[in-house]
Structure formats: C-alpha cells, structure tokens
C-alpha cells in the first residue's frame, strides 16, 4: 500500500509476494503499489536466517520513481486496519476529494485537501495556506492535472520548490483525452527526473485495463476505484 505496503513487507516478509487486497465493498485486483518491490526483489535472506520478527527484512520501497530521501523506517503499518501512521499531506483536485475517505482510512494521520476543478497552478496558494495553518506532512503528495493542460514544467517546479526538499510524489492522471493525459503525465515525469526528492505514483498504469475502477466519465474513481487508489498510495 504505497508507503504503508513497504513497511508492511518489512514486518511480514510474506507480503513481498504479489498480494490480493482485502475485500472492501468491491474488491479491486491491484497490479502494483506505489511503494512496493519494483522488480519483486526484497532483501529477505538475512532476516529469515535469524527467524525473528524483531529483525524485519530490509526492502527497497519503489514507485515508478521513488524520492531518494524517503525513509520508510519512520512509518508503521497495521495489517489489521490496513492503515499507516505516515503523516502525509496531500493536495489535489476532484479525484483526491472523491477518494479522500478511502485515503484517510489508509492514512489516519494524513491531511487531505482535495477540491473539484482545482488546477495545478492553483495548488501553489493552497499548499502555502495549508502549511501556514499547520498542516505540514513529512511526505507530500500532489494529485493534480485533470482540470486543464499543464503549460510548462515550471508550474510543476513551483510546487516542488514549495515542499522544501521533502519527499514528494505526483500521481499520474487517467483521462479519456489522450492529448491532455499524455501532456500532463509527461510534464510530471520530466519534473521528477530533475528532482531527486520527487517520485511518481502511476495511477494511469495502475488503472490500465480496470474500467471497473472508474465512473462513466472515465476520470473519477468509483467506490471500488477509490479503494484501489488508496491501496496504490
């Protein structure tokens, strides 16, 4: 489960195998997680030798791209509640607001600010207002890009600069308009390449072939998709 899944595998090595999500109102079949094993590799050998749960295996958290300063040792995952104690801050648009209940359940300590029709440049002021109000997280996630085309990488860089070097993720978008989808996802990926502290969580890839995750508009996750979205993070 993103940050949570990486920590869970540390605590329970058997989770390193491809996992099926716990049943929710409708059970999605996730194909990968934002932070799990990119190639299925986990460094479990040393931990298994001592046979002790007190020495969890060391794993490499991954997304499509992982912030180089993400320290998952600070976070704990509770398999019973499928929740993580990471104090994540998330700013997004209607996709974020529509999945916020599922995300909040997965990250009880998270601050989530999602608003319909929010465009990426508007998130600069939103982030500043939220942090000024004390809503600052150790990991920042931006879920933006469904409301208009990102004009240039500088718009993305402004948000990156605001985080002050914190581990930061951008989530790719899924749209029925390839021209917007391709442009915006490319902009996010190019910005991530240039900033070591920035990672990419690939909702576009995660939801590929899963029309059951989406409402009829092809953009917004339904109940099943909301759980899949939160699981991905």
Task: Specify the residue positions occupied by each region the protein language model found.
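Conserved SGNH/GDSL esterase-like catalytic core that processes O-acyl groups on lipids
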Residues: 78-155, 175-186
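Short, conserved loop/helix-junction motifs that constitute active-site signature segments
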Residues: 132-135, 159-165
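Conserved beta-strand termini and adjacent loop/short-helix elements that scaffold enzyme active sites
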Residues: 113-115, 171, 201-206
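Short, well-ordered coil/turn elements that cap or connect secondary structure elements
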Residues: 105-107, 163-165, 193-195
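Hydrophobic/aromatic beta-strand patches that form the interior of the parallel beta-sheet core
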Residues: 89-91, 169, 199-201
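N-terminal secretory targeting modules
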Residues: 1-89, 133
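Conserved beta-strand segments of alpha/beta enzyme cores
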Residues: 109-111, 167, 197-199
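Catalytic His-Asp segment of secreted/periplasmic serine-dependent ester chemistry enzymes
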Residues: 181, 185-233
């Amino acid at each position: 489960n993103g940050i949570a899944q990486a920590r869970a595998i540390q605590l329970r090595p058997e989770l390193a195998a491809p996992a099926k999500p716990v049943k929710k109102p409708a059970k999605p079949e996730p194909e990968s997680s934002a932070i799990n094993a990119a190639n299925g590799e986990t460094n479990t050998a040393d931990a298994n030798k001592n046979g002790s749960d007190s020495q969890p295996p060391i794993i490499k958290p991954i997304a499509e791209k992982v912030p180089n300063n993400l320290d998952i040792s600070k976070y704990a995952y509770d398999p019973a509640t499928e929740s993580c104690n990471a104090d994540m801050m998330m700013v997004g648009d209607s996709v974020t607001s529509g999945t916020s209940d599922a995300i909040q359940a997965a990250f009880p300590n998270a601050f989530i600010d999602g608003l319909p029709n929010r465009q990426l440049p508007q998130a600069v002021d939103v982030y500043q207002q939220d942090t000024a109000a004390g809503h600052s997280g150790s990991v920042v996630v931006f879920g933006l890009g469904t409301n208009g085309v990102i004009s240039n990488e500088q718009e993305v860089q402004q948000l990156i600069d605001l985080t002050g070097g914190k581990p930061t993720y951008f989530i790719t978008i899924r749209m029925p308009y390839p021209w917007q989808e391709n442009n915006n996802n490319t902009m996010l990926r190019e910005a991530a390449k240039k900033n070591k502290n920035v990672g990419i969580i690939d909702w576009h890839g995660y939801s590929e072939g899963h029309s059951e995750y989406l409402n009829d508009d092809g953009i917004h996750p339904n109940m099943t998709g909301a759980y899949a979205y939160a699981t991905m993070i």
